[in-house]
């Protein structure tokens, strides 16, 4: 079972899907916990459902049904128990793996069999893109998984501008070789004209206070 932080974002889903496909190829049953009602990856989620991942996702409220004594819980992009999408699953699982790049907090998960922590990595998606290369050619991600991983990296690095290193670009090059289409990934970040205009209105209303831009929004903007 793969899970991440509450209110799933692109780096979490990218890392989850990046692990899902190779693990499934190994003949293991694997599920990704995703709250379909409250997440920030609706466009990528819908796209993955059309690309063969329709059975990959489960809701948090039914995740416990998939947990047994032998279940391995892989937690990505978070390392504190109270931020996990399904904390009750974590409490029940005896075998836990953590993959995260954030600075270690005081209340970190201390019972993991593997705690893969790399604060110099740009994102959890980058870390997973590196890990799956060691699985061998037989268990490599498909193009859909590669695009999900690349999308996660692009979001966390602001299109490869912030927090990038040599390994970031090496991971991106690997995903490109695995079939990731950069044009399709870019489309995941596209918004409608209406949403763009609404954002522009918000930005134009910003007030500068102590070198910070502050906006007041009275309605929800996608």
Residues of each region from the PLM?
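Hydrophobic helix-and-loop "lid/oligomerization" segment in the mid-to-C-terminal part
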Residues: 1-6, 13-49, 64-65, 69-72, ...
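Divalent metal-coordination and catalytic microenvironments
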Residues: 9, 19, 74, 100, ...
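Alpha-helix N-cap/helix-initiation motif
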Residues: 9-12, 117
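Short, hinge-like loop/turn segments at secondary-structure boundaries
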Residues: 47-52, 115-118
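Active-site cofactor/cluster-binding pocket
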Residues: 54-114
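Short, basic, helix/turn surface patches
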Residues: 56-65, 127-132, 212
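Short alpha-helices
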Residues: 101-171
């Amino acid at each position: 079972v793969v899970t991440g932080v509450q209110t799933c974002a692109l780096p979490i889903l990218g890392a989850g899907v990046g692990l899902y496909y190779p693990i499934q190829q190994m003949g293991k049953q694997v599920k990704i916990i995703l709250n379909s009602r409250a997440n920030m990856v609706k466009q990528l989620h819908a796209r993955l459902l059309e690309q063969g991942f329709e059975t990959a996702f489960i809701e948090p409220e039914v995740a416990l049904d998939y947990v047994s004594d032998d279940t391995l819980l892989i937690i990505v992009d978070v390392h504190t128990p109270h931020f996990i999408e399904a904390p009750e699953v974590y409490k029940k699982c005896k075998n836990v793996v953590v993959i995260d790049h954030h600075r270690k907090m005081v209340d970190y998960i201390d019972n993991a069999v593997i705690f893969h922590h790399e604060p110099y990595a740009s994102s959890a998606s980058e870390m997973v893109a590196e890990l799956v290369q060691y699985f061998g050619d037989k268990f490599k991600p498909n193009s859909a998984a590669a695009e999900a991983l690349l999308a996660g990296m692009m979001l966390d690095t602001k299109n490869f501008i912030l927090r990038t290193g040599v390994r970031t670009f090496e991971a991106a090059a690997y995903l490109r070789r695995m079939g990731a289409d950069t044009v399709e990934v870019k489309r995941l970040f596209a918004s409608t004209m209406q949403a763009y205009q609404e954002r522009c209105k918000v930005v134009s209303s910003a007030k500068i206070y102590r070198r910070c831009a502050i906006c007041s929004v009275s309605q929800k903007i996608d």
